[in-house]
Amino acid sequence: MSGFKGYLSTVPVVFAIWLTFTAGLIIEINRLFPDGLVFSF
């Protein structure tokens, strides 16, 4: 089990999980609030 915990704490795994979380968050924000990059005054 300690080997698995050591594997999960490596930088590429943490980086991949972080990118997946960030991409999912951006996708959901764009799904709920589309055209967020367009400034409509």
Swiss-Prot record:
InterPro entries: PSI_PsaJ (IPR002615), PSI_PsaJ_sf (IPR036062). It is a single-pass membrane protein. Keywords: Chloroplast, Membrane, Photosynthesis, Photosystem I, Plastid, Thylakoid, Transmembrane, Transmembrane helix. One of its GO terms (cellular component) is chloroplast thylakoid membrane. Gene3D superfamilies: Single helix bin (1.20.5.510). One of its GO terms (biological process) is photosynthesis. It is found in: Plastid, Chloroplast thylakoid membrane. It comes from the Eukaryota. The chain crosses the membrane at residues 7-27. It holds the Pfam family PSI_PsaJ. May help in the organization of the PsaE and PsaF subunits. Belongs to the PsaJ family. This is Photosystem I reaction center subunit IX. It comes from Bigelowiella natans (Pedinomonas minutissima).
